[in-house]
A protein has these predicted regions:
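Short, mixed-charge aromatic SLiMs
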Residues: 210, 261-271, 305-317
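Hydrophobic alpha-helical bundle signature of multipass membrane enzymes
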Residues: 21-268, 331-423
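Residues in and immediately flanking transmembrane alpha helices
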Residues: 15-16, 246, 289
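Gram-negative bacterial Sec-dependent N-terminal signal peptides
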Residues: 1-19
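Alpha-helical transmembrane segments that form the membrane-embedded catalytic/substrate-binding core
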Residues: 233-237, 267-297, 304
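Charged, amphipathic alpha-helical linkers/stalks
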Residues: 290-363
Length: 423
């Protein structure tokens, strides 16, 4: 084992940045659609339908019918989330401090060149306009499921995904459900600070607001209020996906891609720009790393993780490692091409500014985001992976500080992939 780790360390030191290939927008859209119920797998489609049915049931609650009025008032119930356990811990999430850190991290948004602003609008317009029906329906389900964890089930594969859905509604994942949702740092203050109008409010826009024929099924166009930058839904998607990936590292790559796909859904609906999504990815990654480095949070995380893993193994009737496996046909999130999709969502092909290429500096503790997925590597090796798989400098939110550079350029999917190849 020591020899294997030494070889990996040498390879990382010698390696040039290794990036997933850039793909055009139409290819990214096709990959986004490949993980919808349009996938050519009955097992996967059944999982998607079960997740949607459970979401609609949760949203309806004890009401006679599911109406739009209920959407703003729904959240995980006391069975699903053990909020009493979390409250009793007395843990302080330091929400305001983390919100201010997020605003500082995204400050480059205020000085974007006009070319980037125009391309930002052009890209959301194209994605929204050309999205196929199955992609739009997935986006609607993602949007209305923000208060729950159902959306993560499809990235677990058919067998583990179904076990997750069952255990979640039975309350067997209560600690994880409570902790994950409480770890979402609201983007509300950042939205007020940057005060950027949504794409469908820009004068002369051609955004198509998508009628809801999936969740409430009232054919009302999906819309959103408040500022556009950064995306609150994307912050939720990435936060939830990254924390579950740390709890179930057997599905790490698929869950990272699920976070990216959740953000893509916001653009499909025409309610967010690419930079809204990119900014929220940066903030969510920063926040999750912050929490996982806090020893007091780690105590809660470990307790929640252990409960979740035991419950899922019991529901599966086998080890979690075995339950997480599935054949490629039934598991589109494990298609290697999804790493190309994740790479696309890091930039959405927005213009890269020419200029110096500063050496990437990894913030202290950021490597914790790979710790659970790559426990055989040292902290130094995980930091080297992050450096050697990072995007080039110069993308719109890279900013001027080392921390802005890092979180814009961090490619977790590529770092994980390189580790698999070098091990």
């Amino acid at each position: 084992m020591k020899r294997q780790l030494s070889l990996l360390a040498v390879a990382l030191l010698l390696a040039q940045p290794v990036l997933a290939k850039d793909i055009p927008l139409n290819r990214a859209a096709a990959l986004a659609n490949s993980v919808t119920p349009a996938a050519s797998s009955q097992a996967y489609d059944d999982l998607e339908q079960q997740a949607l049915a459970q979401l609609r049931h949760a949203l309806q609650g004890d009401a006679a019918t599911l109406t739009r009025d209920r959407l703003a008032h729904t959240k995980q119930n006391q069975t699903q989330a053990d909020t009493a356990w979390l409250k009793a811990s007395g843990y302080d999430f330091q929400t305001r401090a983390n919100q201010q850190a997020g605003i500082a991290l995204l400050s480059a948004f205020s000085t974007l060149p006009e070319t980037v602003v125009k391309q930002n609008l052009a890209t959301v317009t194209a994605i929204n306009r050309d999205a196929v029906q199955t992609t739009r329906r997935q986006a609607l389900a993602d949007a209305e499921g923000i208060s729950y964890l159902y959306f993560l089930s499809d990235a677990l594969g058919p067998r583990l995904g179904k076990a997750f859905l069952t255990a979640y509604d039975q309350g067997a994942l209560g600690k994880a459900a409570a902790l994950i949702k409480a770890s979402e740092v609201s983007t509300g203050e950042a939205k007020k600070h940057f005060n950027n109008p949504r794409p469908f409010l820009v004068q002369g826009n051609t955004i198509h607001l998508v009628p809801d024929d999936v969740v409430v099924k009232d054919n009302q166009p999906y819309t959103a209020d408040g500022g556009s930058f950064p995306s609150g839904h994307t912050n939720t998607g990435y936060t939830d996906a990254l924390l579950l990936a740390a709890m179930i590292p057997e599905r790490y790559d698929a869950l990272v891609a699920r976070g990216a796909r959740y953000g893509f859904s916001r653009i499909v609906l025409g309610v967010h720009y690419p930079l809204d999504v990119i900014g929220s990815r940066m903030v969510a990654e920063r926040n999750v790393a912050h929490y996982l480095n806090d020893p007091h949070y780690r105590v809660l995380f470990n307790e929640a993780r252990d409960q979740l893993r035991a419950a899922l193994a019991k529901a599966c009737g086998t080890s979690l490692a075995e339950c997480a496996k599935s054949n490629v046909k039934d598991d589109p999130w494990r298609d290697p091409a999804m790493r190309d999709f994740s790479r696309f969502t890091m930039t959405y092909d927005l213009p890269q500014q020419k200029g110096p290429q500063p050496r990437l500096q990894v913030p202290e503790g950021a490597e914790v985001l790979l710790e659970d997925a790559l426990p055989h590597l040292s902290a130094a090796q995980r930091r080297a992976l992050m450096v050697n798989t990072a995007l080039p400098a110069g993308y719109p939110l890279s900013g001027a500080t080392p921390e802005q550079q890092f979180w814009q350029r961090l490619n977790l999917s590529a770092a994980w992939e390189m580790a698999q190849k070098r091990h």
